[in-house]
Every structure is written in structure tokens, then in C-alpha cells.
Amino acid sequence: MNVLSEKINDYLSTPSSCNFFQKLVILGTMIFIISGLNLIGDNDYVFSQVNASSPPPSPSNNSQQTQESLGSTNRDAILSYEQGNKFLNAKNYDQALISYKNAITFDPNWAAPLIKQGNTYFELANYTTAIKSYDKAFAVLGNLDEKVKSIDKNNGPKPYWLDIWFDKGEALTNLKKFDDAIALYDKLISLDPNWANPWNSIGWALQKQGKNDEAVTAFDNATKLNPSWAKPWNSKGWALYKTGKFDEALSSFDKAISLEPKWDKPWFNKGKIFYDLDKYPDAKQFVEHALSLKADPKTSALLENINAKTESTTTVE
């Protein structure tokens, strides 16, 4: 028997001094109220959407809180922010920026739209402006260095602002401010020693400076922490290739391919090594496969060079 039936049955079976008409009025009121309560219970998602200022954190390997967990009590800010997220996911960056700007105007003390604004500028390769947005978010959040002291490095959820530091480091790397970027990555590693991403980014920053031996060490650390992640295996292979360690490089590329066989980069890199070793048939095989996965001018140019070398070798013979 549901709640409504129970209440009606209790009412009808209880002696009362009310006349029949009064009972009908009271009974109708009870039905209206209880039905309303049932509707609220059956549709509690409506309430949760209205109060969407603090959605639950998305699951991740290190249980970090999402940026949205910063929260806001301003409904207009929340709606503009959510609209911005939809535009960002659709890669409609101009509209995303407008929405995030509106959210910031509605609630200037909410860091989440500042962070996403920075991420949008990052996608547009406007790294300087992205960093300005991240720094404004830091200003809203307060002194994070003080909050660092309360972080449990091995257990429990990690704070959302670790991601902001990482994003700022990536922007600094793209601006070739490698020392500043590596300093941020080092700080992240000290806070979360089990996170592979900063090690991979350190390797990339070192590689950009031609410090390939040091880069190999950084990529090694990334692969140890996340052995199923193809990117550091591929990057390690390229750093090894740059130091002339072709066999080790090929082994790293093979590992990347085994983890992500439809990714064109390690296939291209294998082809480049065989091209440099004058093994043109092997080089052609891998480069053609890379092209079948993704059309790329750089890959097409390498294939043309391989074909030219093959024709030249055939003519000489």
C-alpha cells in the first residue's frame, strides 16, 4: 500500500465530529499535499539541477576534486558557466569565452569560470592570456601555499587546484618559459608523487631544450607511474632516437603502439628511424600505415622522400 492510500485509510477509519462535506474537503486537501510530496520524491533530480552549484566530483585515478566543486550560489553565474562548458566541449571557443565572462561578471569570487576561461584561451594557443586567467583564479582562491601544508600526499582526495598549476605549467612550456614550467611541475610532484603527468611534461620541456638524456629519465618516471599510458612511451622513444639509441627507441615506439595501435605518431617515428638507417622498404611500410591512420603533411613529405630514395637506389643498382 502506498503512502497516499495509508493516509486516506487512517483518516476514514478514525472517528471524527466532521460532517461528510467537511471530510471531503479535508480529504481532498490531504490528497493534494501527499501527491505533491510523492512528486517531489519521484523527481528529486529537478531539485538537484536547480542546486547545481556543487556537482559531485568526477572519478579520477588520484580522486581529485573537479574545478566545479569551488561552487557558487549565484544562479545566473551557474547557468552561464554551464553554457560555457557546452560551448567549450563543442569547440565553439568564442561563445565559450562570452559565457565564462558573463559567469565571472555575475560572481567574480567564483574561480571555476576563470579556470575554464584560461583553458579556452589555451585551446586557442593564446597562452599569455590563459596564464592571466589562471592567476586571477589563484587570487580568488587565496594563498594556496598555506593550503599545501594540509595535503595528504598519499591518501585522500587531491585538491582541484593541482590541475590549475599543471595547466599553467603547460602554458609556460608552450611559451618556452621552461624553467618556470619545470618549477611548477616539481611542486606538483612534491604534492602528488604518484601523478605521471608532471613527469611527462618535465620530459617534454627538457626535450624542447635539447636535454634528451634528462628527458629520458623523466619519461621513465612517467611510464613507471602509469605504464599503460602510450604518450610517455612515444616521447621516451623520440628522446632516445635523438641520442642515437635506435634499438631502445624502437622498443619504446613498439610499446606505445601496443597500447594505442591507432595512434599515428609512433608509427611515423618508427618509419623515421628506418629512413635514417637507409632501410627504405621498412620505413615505407610504417609511414604508409601512419598515413592510413591520420593524414598529415609531415608524414606525406617523409613518404615522398622515402619513395625518392627508393627510386634513386633502384636506378643506381
Give the ranges of each region predicted by the language model.
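Residue-level recognition of tetratricopeptide repeat
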Residues: 76, 110, 144, 161, ...
